[in-house]
UniProtKB/Swiss-Prot annotation:
Its EC number is 2.4.2.9. The gene is pyrR. Keywords: Glycosyltransferase, RNA-binding, Transcription, Transcription regulation, Transcription termination, Transferase. This is Bifunctional protein PyrR. A motif (PRPP-binding) lies at residues 102-114. Regulates transcriptional attenuation of the pyrimidine nucleotide (pyr) operon by binding in a uridine-dependent manner to specific sites on pyr mRNA. This disrupts an antiterminator hairpin in the RNA and favors formation of a downstream transcription terminator, leading to a reduced expression of downstream genes. Also displays a weak uracil phosphoribosyltransferase activity which is not physiologically significant. InterPro entries: PRibTrfase_dom, PRTase-like, PyrR, PyrR_bifunctional. It comes from Listeria welshimeri serovar 6b (strain ATCC 35897 / DSM 20650 / CCUG 15529 / CIP 8149 / NCTC 11857 / SLCC 5334 / V8).
Length: 183
């Protein structure tokens, strides 16, 4: 079994999301023209949690959507290797993003490739006024010039490690762990 070190427990995740919610509100001077878009899979659940906290803090309902970046990735995955048909899950943005301040939400920022794909997918939906990035964990090792605007926790890692965020909505656990790939 691979060695796992817990770097964020359930309480730390909750605190980080609350802080990020306040930062989003402060930087955008409220919630006017603000929208949250979660990157599948865990980014969707984190966007929903940020939405809930912003609603509690400001009393304003911010639109929330989700984006599937499957067709925009440079490491496309397939549901069937024989047909080479991509595994597409669908995008759900039930509001106009034109002129909005969109906050893309993801669980872990690593190379920046997922975020680049998400921005490409978002631009195919519309033209936001601004795109910001919120992540629960930033582990470094960027390959592209991408930086998160809102970070729950910076988690430095080596090339042999990966950060895995587990949410009860998907994983039946609530934490962030560093996993050593060599153990």
């Amino acid at each position: 079994m691979q060695k796992q070190v817990v770097v964020m427990d359930e309480a730390a995740i909750k605190r980080a999301l609350t802080r990020v919610s306040y930062e989003i509100i402060e930087r955008n001077k409220g919630t006017k023209d603000l929208a949250l878009v979660g990157i599948k899979t865990r980014g969707i659940y984190l966007a929903e949690r940020l939405h809930t906290r912003i609603l509690e803090i400001e009393g304003m309902d911010v639109p929330v959507g989700d984006i599937d970046i499957t067709l925009y990735r440079d490491d496309l995955s397939y549901k069937d290797d024989d047909t080479r048909e991509p595994a597409v899950h669908g995008t759900n943005i039930p509001f106009d993003i034109n002129g909005k301040k969109v906050v893309l939400v993801d669980d872990v920022l690593y190379t920046g490739r997922t975020v680049r794909a998400a921005m490409d997918a978002l631009m195919d939906v519309g033209r936001p006024a601004q795109i910001h990035l919120a992540v629960l964990a930033d582990r470094g090792h960027r390959e592209l010039p991408i930086r998160a605007d809102y970070v729950g926790k910076n988690i430095p890692t080596s090339a042999n490690e990966r950060v895995e965020v587990r949410l009860t909505d998907v994983d039946h656990a609530e934490d962030a762990v560093i996993i050593n790939k060599n153990e």
